[in-house]
Swiss-Prot record:
It comes from the Bacteria. GO terms for molecular function: glutamate-5-semialdehyde dehydrogenase activity; NADP binding. Belongs to the gamma-glutamyl phosphate reductase family. This is Gamma-glutamyl phosphate reductase. GO terms for biological process: L-proline biosynthetic process. It holds the Pfam family Aldedh. PANTHER family: DELTA-1-PYRROLINE-5-CARBOXYLATE SYNTHASE, GLUTAMATE SEMIALDEHYDE DEHYDROGENASE. One of its GO terms (cellular component) is cytoplasm. InterPro entries: Ald_DH/histidinol_DH, Ald_DH_C, Ald_DH_N, Aldehyde_DH_dom, G-glutamylP_reductase_CS, Glu-5-SA_DH, GPR_dom.
Length: 412
């Protein structure tokens, strides 16, 4: 592992001075390589799915693990989208001239070496790699045992693309073992080789990384996302948004887990809940909702802090916007919250009083995604307040330097 870290640092030094044209050529070569090796990639994924069935992996994890032609095409498209993004490296963030004539520029620079530790999503192999490459960073990937075959097949295509573009193959390295001790070594930083760790996976993985890492991390513990339906909301809009936010893909961190309804308008929005039930969604709710919809289960205290990642939704009535804010402040993981309302005064209160990384108005929580933000892809969602927050794209994978130009000035 130490040798891998040293190779990554050497590759990072080379990538830092690569031109935009060189990096974009490599991204196109990677896209072509993924297309050429698509059959092998899908076959490797099939083996992972067979193993998942034998290991009784839950539905949400299997959904994250699964690749098909459509998802693979989406991954390939994201590679080309990232290639089309502006190169962040070398961008002048701001500049000014001091009274003594010194001209100061704040310029974006790569972070260096990024370690990515992830579990069942094979797409992370590509998303993380291409974002690191575009931003001039080397990557060390450690995929989970569930996606082992898929991740290695995808990595093979990545290395082929790098080689054909003339870039160092050590720019994107993958740990070739399932040994969990490797994670501990990465969290220690590989003797200073790793600059940042990004975990992508379940609560246990992220909690371990947050507890044990000796290097900075970009992470979120869980996606406990909320939607508040205000009495001013449009019924059809509320129905469409909640159905999408819960059921489009239940196993992603942007799926809504709790819906809060203005108590004054509960009967108006009952069709939202019946529509969910018709789609097979289990609802766990407060007593006033159970009274009106007897086939709804009574929610327990644990339901308000539960990330289901399944077709299950907790629903609660609240005393207007103040009640919604109080609930979200108590239970939110700081990921994503949405308000459905036409009253802009209420919307303003929602946006001003909540501190989650992403706040939405009249839109599904499933838009909490770097691709949907125009970032091409994302390496993860960060809920911390230092450096990166929200979807982590190419700009968030850079630091900055101050470039100071003088004309012989000395300090008095």
């Amino acid at each position: 592992m130490k040798d891998m870290g040293q190779k990554a640092r050497h590759a990072a030094a080379l990538l830092a001075v690569m031109s935009s044209e060189q990096k974009n050529k490599a991204l196109e070569m990677i896209a072509l390589s993924l297309e050429a090796q698509s059959a092998e990639i899908l076959q490797a994924n099939h083996q992972d799915l067979v193993n998942a069935a034998q290991n009784n992996l839950n539905v949400a994890m299997v959904d994250r693990l699964k690749l098909d032609k459509v998802r693979l095409c989406t991954i390939i498209d994201s590679v080309r989208q990232v290639a089309c993004l502006p190169d962040p490296v070398g961008q002048v963030m701001s500049e000014w001239t001091r009274p003594n004539g010194l001209h100061i520029r704040r310029v974006r620079t790569p972070l260096g070496v990024i370690g990515i530790i992830y579990e069942s999503r094979p797409s992370v192999t590509i998303d993380a790699s291409i974002l690191c490459l575009k931003s001039g960073n080397a990557a060390i990937l450690r995929g989970g045992s569930d996606s082992f075959h898929s991740a290695h097949a995808l990595h093979s295509a990545l290395v082929k693309g790098l080689k054909e573009a003339g870039l160092p193959q050590d720019a994107i390295q993958m740990v070739g073992t399932k040994d969990r001790d490797v994670v501990g070594e990465m969290l220690k930083g590989l003797d200073g080789a790793i600059d940042v760790i990004v975990p992508r996976g379940g609560k246990d993985l992220v909690a371990r990384v947050q507890s044990d890492a000796r290097v900075p991390i970009f992470a979120h513990l869980e996606g406990l996302c909320h939607i508040y339906i205000d009495q001013s909301a449009d019924l059809d809009m509320a129905r469409n948004i909640v159905l999408n936010a819960k059921l489009r893909r239940t196993g992603i961190c942007g799926a809504v887990e709790t819906v809060l309804i203005d108590r004054q308008a509960l009967k108006k929005f009952l069709p939202v809940l019946t529509a969910l039930q018709e789609k097979g969604c289990e609802i766990r709710a407060t007593e006033d909702i159970v009274f009106l919809l007897p086939d709804v289960k009574l929610a327990s205290e644990e339901d308000w802090s539960q990330e289901y990642l399944d077709a299950i939704l907790s629903v609660k009535t609240v005393e207007g916007i103040e009640g919604a804010i109080a609930h979200i402040r108590r239970y939110s993981s700081g990921h994503t919250e949405s308000i459905i309302a036409e009253d802009m005064k209420v919307v303003k209160i929602f946006f001003n009083c909540l501190d989650s990384a992403i706040l939405l108005h009249n839109a599904s929580t499933q838009f909490a995604d770097g691709g949907e933000f125009g970032f091409g892809a994302e390496i993860g969602i960060a809920t911390g307040k230092m450096h990166a927050r929200g979807p982590v794209g190419v700009e968030q994978l850079t630091s900055f330097q101050y470039h100071v130009k003088g004309n012989g000035q000395v300090r008095s």
